[in-house]
């Protein structure tokens, strides 16, 4: 049976990451040259080191290409050698110590002991994430934003008290780092009750913790991509933050008529998709978002979801709206939000007076370019791409382990 990642990442052009695929291709050469026979699973230490060093040679070259790209972009240039090799490359906020990350992750990845499975998409993704966390551990981190579903908790579930990620979030707060749940879920109520219910396990744990009040106040929730901000108060829980104090000036000038036109156009497109693709779902319209959710007990097919989100994106892009929007696949529903996570991260940096994107991290599970709402955060902060809440915990533990060295 084909794995989920083979279906998602290998067969669908719009679901590929060119940079990861390029590195994977580079690493396939030493794999072929160094692959052993089936009887060599327990290879010698000398053989392992030789194999890893071949991978390291390539990753060192990639490190140098990234550093050169950063330098050229900082000087106002646009075309580096890396850009020519991977045309879709945009910006790196920091160098990436890929070799160090590979060696640190080798006990988990077992790259040197594999004879039949070459370094994969997931292996490269893990090395990139590990390298980013390694750099941040050495150079400082002021803010971490997390997607919600499939990053902190399973899709559609609340953040319950027994979720092991909670202790890691509290550890970040204890170090004076801003922790933000940056979620697409948009609830415009000023009471914040929906977010309080959704994140009750975390909020209760913070209340019961020995964190200082100043550390507790560093927890925030930004909902609807970049629309509703709530700050944690030690006495009153999540409290509404007025938009005038944290939204970027340009966001305050967005024409209300254009926002309505975007939502109307998206709603019309989604209704057409429901009818044309025989989707058993209903439209949900909110103040700054519109989407469809399946009827009770229904599970929508991936192809239906992808077709709907891509058609919605294309329809809106043709109209050339000035107001940013995000159309994305939520796993079993489709949504179109006003704003995006790039703006969300930029708003937070402005609100917290953080000097540079290199001191901010966004962790999420949706970084492919089409129909995925974490992708745009790359333009505002460093990022780590996870595939599950368990991986989020692993990466955070990896970060903490490097802080101790």
UniProtKB/Swiss-Prot annotation:
Per the record, its GO cellular-component terms are: cytosol; nucleus
Enzyme class at the top of the EC tree: hydrolase
What residues bind Mg(2+), as annotated?
A: 147, 149, 365
UniProt: ATP binding residues: 108
Q: Which domain of life is it from?
A: Eukaryota
Report the Pfam families cross-referenced here: ISN1
Q: How is its activity regulated?
A: Allosterically activated by ATP. ATP binding is a prerequisite to magnesium and substrate binding. ATP binds to 2 of the subunits in the homotetramer inducing a closure of these 2 subunits and the release of the C-terminal loop, thereby activating the enzyme.
What reaction(s) does this enzyme catalyze? Answer: IMP + H2O = inosine + phosphate
Positions of IMP binding: 147, 149, 155, 183, 333, 341
Give the UniProt keywords, A-Z: ATP-binding, Hydrolase, Magnesium, Metal-binding, Nucleotide metabolism, Nucleotide-binding
The prosthetic group or cofactor this protein requires is:
Mg(2+)
**What GO biological process terms does the UniProt entry carry, in alphabetical order?**
inosine salvage; nicotinamide riboside biosynthetic process; nicotinic acid riboside biosynthetic process; nucleotide metabolic process
Per the Swiss-Prot or TrEMBL record, the active site comprises 147, 149
Documented EC number(s): 3.1.3.99
According to the UniProt entry, its GO molecular function terms are: ATP binding; IMP 5'-nucleotidase activity; magnesium ion binding
Question: What family classification does the UniProt entry report for this protein?
Answer: Belongs to the ISN1 family.
Q: Which PANTHER family match?
A: IMP-SPECIFIC 5'-NUCLEOTIDASE 1
Q: What is this protein's function?
A: IMP-specific 5'-nucleotidase involved in IMP (inositol monophosphate) degradation.
Question: How does the record describe its quaternary structure?
Answer: Homotetramer.
Name-wise, this protein is: IMP-specific 5'-nucleotidase 1
Origin species, per record, is Schizosaccharomyces pombe (strain 972 / ATCC 24843)
């Amino acid at each position: 049976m084909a794995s989920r990642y083979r279906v998602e990442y290998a067969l669908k052009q719009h679901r590929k990451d060119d940079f990861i695929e390029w590195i994977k291709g580079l690493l396939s050469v030493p794999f072929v040259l160094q692959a052993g026979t089936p009887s060599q699973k327990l290879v010698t230490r000398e053989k392992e080191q030789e194999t890893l060093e071949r991978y390291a040679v390539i990753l060192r070259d990639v490190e140098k290409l990234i550093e050169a790209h950063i330098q050229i972009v900082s000087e106002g240039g646009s075309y580096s050698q890396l850009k020519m090799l991977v045309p879709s490359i945009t910006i790196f906020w920091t160098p990436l110590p890929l070799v160090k990350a590979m060696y640190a992750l080798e006990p988990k990845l077992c790259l040197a002991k594999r004879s039949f499975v070459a370094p994969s998409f997931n292996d490269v993704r893990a090395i990139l994430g590990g390298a980013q966390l390694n750099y941040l551990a050495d150079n400082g981190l002021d803010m971490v934003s997390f997607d919600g579903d499939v990053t902190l908790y399973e899709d559609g579930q609340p953040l319950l008290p027994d979720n092991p990620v909670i202790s890691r979030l509290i550890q970040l707060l204890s170090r004076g780092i801003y922790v933000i749940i940056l979620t697409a879920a948009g609830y415009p109520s000023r009471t914040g009750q929906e977010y309080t219910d959704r994140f009750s396990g975390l909020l209760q744990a913070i209340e019961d913790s020995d964190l200082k009040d100043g550390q507790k106040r560093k927890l925030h929730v930004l909902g609807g991509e970049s629309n509703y901000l709530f700050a944690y108060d030690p006495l009153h829980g999540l409290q509404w933050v007025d938009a005038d104090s944290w939204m970027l000036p340009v966001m305050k000038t967005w024409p209300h008529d254009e926002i309505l036109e975007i939502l109307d156009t998206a709603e019309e497109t989604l209704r057409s998709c429901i009818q044309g693709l025989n989707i058993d779902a209903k439209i949900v319209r909110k103040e700054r978002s519109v989407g469809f959710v399946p009827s009770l007990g229904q599970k929508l097919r991936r192809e239906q979801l992808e077709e709907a989100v891509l058609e919605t994106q294309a329809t809106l892009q043709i109209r050339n709206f000035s107001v940013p929007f995000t159309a994305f696949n939520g796993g079993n529903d489709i949504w179109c939000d006003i704003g995006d996570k790039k703006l969300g991260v930029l708003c937070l940096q402005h609100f917290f007076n953080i000097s540079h994107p290199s001191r901010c991290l966004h962790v999420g599970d949706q970084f492919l370019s089409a129909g995925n709402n974490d992708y745009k955060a790359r333009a505002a902060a460093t990022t780590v791409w996870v595939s599950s809440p368990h991986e989020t915990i692993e990466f955070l533990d990896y970060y903490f382990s490097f802080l101790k060295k």
